[in-house]
Each structure stands twice: as C-alpha cells, then as structure tokens.
C-alpha cells in the first residue's frame, strides 16, 4: 500500500511486474483522431498483454506484497488452477541494489521507498520518532536488517493461554518455521570485525551471559533462553551480502522472469488500495478492493474467493477504517459511514522501544554485514513485574558501529564523527497505543499514538534504566574499552535512576516493530469464548475479520503481543500457517468447492 500515488514512478516494471490496465473508462477524444497509438493506448496495450483480457477478477486478492503477502502469494499459487493478485504500493525490488545489498539498509530510511510515518506527540517519550515502513516488494523484509529469530515457545503459549488463541500454541506454530524458504544463518565468521567480537566477550564477562554461536538454534531446540550473547542469525547470502528477503525467497523465483514463473500470479505494483468492496446483496461479504494507480486511474479488483489483508500493522487497520470497519464513534466523527462496528480496529498498538548509550571512538570500525551484527539478552526485572510472567529475557541490546545521533543531538548532545552505540531494547513493552485516521481522505497519513512510557508501574522506563547501567558496565571491560574514547550520551553527569530514566525516554527510538492493531483472539459467543473482548478483530481460528465474510488478515497486526525478539520470522510462520488454513478451506472431502462463500 502507498499513502499517496507517486507521479515520478511507473505503475509497473514491464519486465518483472504486472499492473492493472491504466486507461480511463472514457477515452480522451483525441485518442481516436491520432494517426498512431497514443501513450495511453500503448500502455493499455502493454497492460492487456500482461493481463489477458484486462483481467480484474481473481480467486484471491492479497493487499500488500510484503513479508506475509509474499508467503501467501507463493503458497496459494502452488495450485495452478488458482489465480492470485497481489496489490503492492511500491515498485519491484528486482535489480535494485540499494534494496538487495543488505549493507545499504540505512540508505532506504527516509527515501522514496519509505512511507516515513510520524508519531503524534508523546508526553512521556520522544515525539520525533519516524516509523519507517517499506514501500517496495518484500515489504519490511526488503527494508530491515533481516535479524531472524524464531519466537520463544513461551511467546506463543502466552497467546494460547492468556489471549484466547488456543489454535496458536508453540506446539502448533513452531513446525512452520521449518518451512521457511529464506536462507537464515549466523553472521559469517569472516564478516565479524574485532570491535563486535570484543563487545561479545565484554558482554559475557560483565553479565555472565553465555556466548552462543547460533542463537536461533538454541531457540529451536530448547524453546528459548533467559540470557545469552552472540552474533545474530540473519536472512542473507554470506558470500554476496545480498538479502534473502521474503521477496527474494518467495516471489523472485515465480515472477515472470524467474526460473519457475507462474502464470497464475499477478503483481499490481505501485498500486494503492483505497477501500474494500462489499457484495451488493450481502453487506457482510467483501468481494474486492478499489485501487488507484499513480496516475489516479481507478479499478476494482474482485475476489472470487477472498481478500487477504497483508498491509502491515499500520496500513491494514487504516484500510479497514477507510472501508467503514472499526470503532463507530471514530468513523462517524470523520464523516465516514460505519458499515461494521469493530471497536478493536487500530487498538493494541505495540512496539519494541529502545534507547541509546553512545561512546566516541577513534575511527569507524571495519564494515560488517549491516553495522549491527551482534546482540545481548538479559533478565533485569523479576518475572512478576510483567502481568503474564515470562521466563525469557526482558532486555535486549544491539551494538551499532555508527553514530545514531539524531535523537541525542536534538536534546543538546554533540554528534561525534565516529561512535559506537549500545541500544537497550524493551523485549515485552507494556505500553499500548492506537492507530487512527487523520481524516476521511485515504491519501492522508494515519495517526500513530504508541503511548510510549505511559504504561502503569513505569515498567518500560525501568527496563531502560537497567539497560543504561549494564551498557556502562560492558564498556568498562577489556579489551572492548580500548575502542572507546569517552561516553557521549547520556554522559558521566547522568547517574541517578531518575535522571537516567528521563534521558532514556527523551532519546528513545524504535526498532520498527509495530504490531497488534487487528489482534486475533476468540470472539465472544463462538468457539467457546466467554465474555466480550472488544479488542479482538480477527478470529484466531481462521484469521477472518470478526462478523465479515470473504476477508482475512495476515500480518503483524494480528499478533496479540510481540514476540520477545525481532518478529519477522514469527510473521512468516503465521503466514505459512495462514496459507494452509486458506487452502484447506477451499476443499471439502477432496473436492474443490464450487461455491466458495
């Protein structure tokens, strides 16, 4: 999805992508008088070639060609008798070195491939946080650092036991991790520079955390860990440094110029989904999506079976709200008709907030895979500090070998030329916010209110206070301390818990993991659900939007809570399971349904 069509970019990559026919319903009068084909006619001819007959009806319409959407597009088109359309707001990533070269991920922040959503003012946090959201095929897996961790068993069992998701325990979900197509490996030894190696040893020495060579394998075989330090598992090719994103792994092989192209896959690139379309005879049934190309021309893409929303934790609730699905009072306040009152749409917004501790260094360390190749995991508060006690770590550190100084400079700190940053990260933030609409205009960016550090008991702030203290202890260890010149931020003058907490909140940032805004659960009155939980948007049994037919959600928005560590693999695993649920629903007693709805 895209917040606004970009007139500088084409609707399609004619080699690697496909698009809707881009011509008006009523041709311009000059078109018939020209001696040769007009530009619009040539474009229409190209579109007709790519989509025979100007096809706008498919079995499945997927909104969002990102992390989850790529998985679903691949798995559903394995049935050659099924046609699948993917609506993607950005361009193809094929041949784009800025996207495919993992080392260049920082170049994409704030670029034309970034939706760059601001946050609303945060009374207790940093009001200047920009949430980077990818505008490119592959979504955030084409935009992030590809740090790849399976969820801890306890993360998934928490959904089952405490969030009315009995269909999603670890025993059910973990096997889907074995199906992932991405190449996930620890950072290659030859790409581990001495600074990162020394930091890993210093972290272990200061905290007692064991050094694990393959953190992900430890999760797979033991279900998780409480503390550990080591180099990350990353989805990449260690020889070329190229991404193994969801797009590269799931879409590139089956696209028109891929080695296993599938003619039943139709990519609509640089195409914006405006609203859902309802059956004229059944207001509870979704039958398609209204879309707009960058030229402002509109089409309706119809789904014979289902529409599947994979636009992410920001744009999936945004599309639902613009389609009249959400809290009645919020919609009517903007002049939007409420077609289905689903109060939970946009609620439960959560994230992995982080702060920063920065030291000046003498020079920039040798380049690594993506400047943040190792991590530390600790338990710093007692388990009863959380509403649902969790045995895993509650604090995570990244080490960045570049100066992340925007937020510190804003509050008066110097910007060093060379720096190392440790970023304490809250594994299970207790703050919950909201995504809402700024106006009834689909082109306007939504309002993101994460309510950073507004959780009761100041749990999130307490985690960061402990994180700053541990960072300083690590910096005292040899040989790592030989790389450091001086502490820049928060600086030696900041010592009390009160001062550390205030600093940590003011310069806090995000690791870009918004989730939970269309959370799954058990709707009241069905599947044995008790009571009424209005925060549930998606039925955990099948990922269908509560009270509607023909529309499902599969992306980070359905997660009741974030997993302890980076959520990308969790989202991929949810998508693998969703594909299986969707395919199974299309068959009865070994026969394909003739009337899907």
Language-model-derived ranges and their functions:
Residues 2-59, 584-597:
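Extreme N-terminal leader/targeting segments of oxidoreductases
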Residues 36-175, 337-345, 351-361, 371-375, ...:
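N-terminal glycine-rich phosphate/pyrophosphate-binding loop and immediately adjacent elements
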Residues 79-85, 90-95, 100, 169, ...:
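Glycine-rich loop(s) and the adjacent beta-strand/alpha-helix scaffold that form part
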Residues 145, 160-279, 285-286, 356-360, ...:
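Conserved redox-cofactor binding core of oxidoreductases
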Residues 260-264, 317, 321, 325-428, ...:
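Mid-to-C-terminal "cap/lid" subdomains and adjacent gly/pro-rich loops that border
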Residues 268-269, 274-277, 479-562, 569, ...:
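A glycine-rich dinucleotide-binding beta-alpha-beta segment and adjacent secondary-structure elements
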Residues 404-462, 524-527, 531-565:
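Active-site beta-strand/loop architecture of penicillin-binding DD-peptidases
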Residues 561-580:
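A conserved FAD-binding loop/helix module that cradles the flavin
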């Amino acid at each position: 999805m895209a917040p606004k069509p970009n007139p500088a970019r084409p609707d399609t990559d004619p080699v690697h992508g496909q698009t809707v026919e881009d011509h008006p319903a009523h041709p311009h009068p000059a078109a018939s008088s020209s001696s040769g084909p007009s530009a619009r006619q040539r474009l229409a001819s190209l579109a007709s070639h790519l989509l025979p007959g100007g096809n706008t009806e498919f079995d499945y319409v997927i909104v969002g060609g990102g992390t989850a959407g790529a998985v679903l597009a691949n798995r559903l088109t394995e049935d050659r008798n099924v046609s699948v359309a993917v609506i993607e707001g950005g361009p193809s990533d094929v041949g784009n070195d800025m996207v495919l070269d993992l080392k260049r991920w920082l170049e994409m922040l704030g670029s034309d491939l970034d939706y760059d959503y601001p946050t609303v003012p945060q009374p207790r946090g940093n009001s200047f946080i920009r949430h980077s959201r990818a505008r490119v095929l592959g979504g955030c897996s084409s935009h992030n650092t590809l740090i790849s961790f399976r969820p801890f068993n306890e993360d998934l069992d928490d959904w089952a036991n405490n969030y009315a998701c009995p269909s999603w325990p670890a025993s059910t979900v973990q096997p889907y991790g074995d199906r992932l197509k991405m190449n996930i490996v620890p950072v290659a030894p030859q790409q581990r520079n001495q600074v990162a190696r020394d930091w890993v040893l210093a972290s272990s020495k200061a905290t007692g955390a064991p050094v694990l060579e393959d953190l992900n394998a430890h999760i797979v075989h033991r279900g998780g860990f409480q503390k550990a330090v080591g180099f990350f598992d990353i989805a990449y090719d260690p020889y070329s440094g190229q991404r193994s994103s969801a797009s590269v792994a799931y879409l590139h092989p089956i696209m028109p110029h891929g080695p296993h192209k599938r003619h039943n896959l139709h990519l609509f690139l640089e195409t914006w989904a405006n609203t859902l379309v309802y059956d004229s005879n059944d207001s509870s049934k979704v039958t398609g999506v209204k879309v707009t190309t960058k030229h402002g021309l509109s089409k309706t893409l119809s789904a014979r079976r289902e529409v599947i929303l994979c636009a992410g934790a920001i744009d999936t609730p945004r599309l639902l709200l613009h389609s009249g699905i959400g809290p009645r009072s919020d919609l009517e306040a903007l002049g939007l008709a409420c077609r289905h009152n689903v109060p939970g749409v946009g609620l439960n917004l959560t994230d992995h907030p982080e702060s920063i501790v920065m030291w000046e260094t003498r020079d920039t360390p040798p380049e690594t895979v993506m400047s943040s190749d190792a991590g530390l995991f600790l338990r710093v508060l007692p388990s009863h500090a959380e509403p649902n006690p969790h045995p895993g770590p509650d604090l995570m550190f990244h080490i960045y070998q570049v100066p992340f100084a925007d937020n510190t400079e804003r509050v008066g700190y110097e910007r060093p030329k060379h720096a190392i940053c440790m970023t304490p990260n809250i594994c299970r933030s207790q703050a919950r916010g909201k995504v809402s609409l700024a106006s009834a205009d689909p082109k306007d960016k939504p309002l993101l209110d994460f309510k950073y550090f507004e959780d009761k008991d100041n749990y999130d702030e307490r985690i960061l206070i402990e994180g700053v203290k541990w960072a300083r202890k690590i910096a005292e260890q040899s040989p790592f301390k030989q790389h450091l010149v001086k502490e820049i931020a928060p600086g030696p003058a900041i010592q009390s818990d009160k001062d550390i907490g205030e600093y940590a909140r003011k310069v806090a940032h995000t690791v870009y993991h918004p989730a939970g805004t269309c959370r799954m659960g058990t709707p009241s009155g069905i599947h044995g659900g008790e009571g009424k939980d209005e925060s549930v948007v998606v039925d955990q049994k099948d990922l269908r939007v509560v009270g509607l037919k023909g529309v499902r959600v599969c992306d980070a928005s359905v997660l009741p809570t974030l997993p302890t560590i980076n959520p990308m693999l969790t989202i991929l695993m949810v998508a693998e399971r969703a594909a299986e649920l969707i395919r199974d629903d299309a068959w009865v007693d070994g026969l394909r349904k003739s009337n899907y709805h």
